[in-house]
Amino acid sequence: LNDRFGEILYGMPIIEDAEVAYKETRMVELVGIKKILDKYRDLVLQVRVGGTDFSSVFGVRRGVDYSIYDIMTVRECLSDIINICGRDNDYVISGPVWEYFRAPKELMFEELPHHGIEDYLMKRLPIVNNEIDGLLREVIQDKANGFVGRTVIHPSHVKFVNALMAVTKEEYDDACQILGTGGGVVKGAGGNKMNEIKPHTNWAKKVYNRARAFSVIENEGAFVKLFAVNE
């Protein structure tokens, strides 16, 4: 189409078919998909994943109090997709849809402690409401596993997903330090971690690019300010 019409059309393919869900065909299917993606790499904006479709294959559905990562069969699918398509930051892979929504009326807190939102969510302390808090917990797990952004099915989800994609200043400073250092090991910007240049380079590139797209915030306590439920 690009050659025929002289336009540049970009793609966001979605991986969600049963051949990927089934363990015995998954690797062959994913390697084949990766070969096709590589032919058009400059035109692939993002690779999406179908958590709901994978769940359907096995007749399961996560509840509002569970994460897609709690569904063992689906977790394996997502893990292998990241393994094949996410090596060396080959492609941006977004997290799956969260299917629960309820319009937020107000936040439980105006500001969280500096140590942050993950502590609240993983201890199941309320922040917005049950449906949105479940989404937030899953986005935190997305980031930990290498997903960037996610497909959303309801407008109320957008600001929460985008907010949690923002990078804290400490993460950003660490990423810049790693990318600006020739090698070896250095103390992290917060004085609380080791930054090993070579092993952490891919992480630093991903964080730096995420910061360019979603901005940098002072600390985890500032995530709540980005939720802006009344706007």
Describe every region a protein language model picked out:
Residues 1-231:
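Expand to "…catalyze enediolate/carbanion chemistry for C-C bond making/breaking, isomerization
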